[in-house]
Amino acid sequence: AKVINATFTRGGNLVIPAFSVGRTQEMLYFIRRIKTENLLPEHPNFEVYIDSPLAVEATNVFHENISDCFDEEAMELISAGINPIKFPGLRVAVSSDESKMINFDKKPKVIISASGMCEAGRIRHHLKHNLWRSDSTVLFVGYQVPGTLGYALLNGAKKVKLFGEEIEVRASIVNLPGISGHADKNQLTEWLGAIKNKPEHVFIVHGEESTAESFANHVHETFGYDAVAPYSGDAYDLITNQKVADGSRKLVEKKAAYGMASREKTIFDRLVA
């Protein structure tokens, strides 16, 4: 609520790069609470746009499969006749024309769009229209992989290239910690401890290098398991439990989505929209 209030007070837009399935709906849940509890009395009727065809479809799936998609807290709201991810001022953009019109509207608003790491999809258009604005804010609500545009912005990039144009970053860049679709260290430790048949080998294959190696050491110290965080290309024989090949230890520079051929990029954009 503080981020929204500060942005709207400046007269800017709040742009939220979010994964279409799960994270977008989670943001809608939080924003509904902000509106319902009147946490922004100075901006009570602000509009929220979902600008992602996949996110719109996923949200419809949530509406149509209530018992499968919501937790106990949300089900209590539903039992009371409250839709946990729907509220006054919620708008959706499906067509490209609807998407373009969002940026013609000068009123301060919240824009939720994909992809969550800003590598493709309509979010890149909204970044182009808002990054140069000192009154706007980009709020990251998910992990940003090194090499992605989202990672660059979150780590202080002063200029970025979008659609062949260099954009100066003047908007406020904010990270919302504590929101993750993954289990944390304690939850993973608890899960490993519940395994009845002790694994012969544990591979830590997700996360940044230092974090993965630290967790592998934690697993070994806690359970005595043979744990390792392999590099890309490392090969292990799962029968003999031996390492048979070393992968690359060099950091591979990530190729941006806009470097793809036209047809490949079109397909990629549709998948992450």
For the regions a language model picked out, list residue spans one by one.
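Acidic/His-rich, metal-assisted hydrolase cores and their charged scaffolds
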Residues: A1-A273
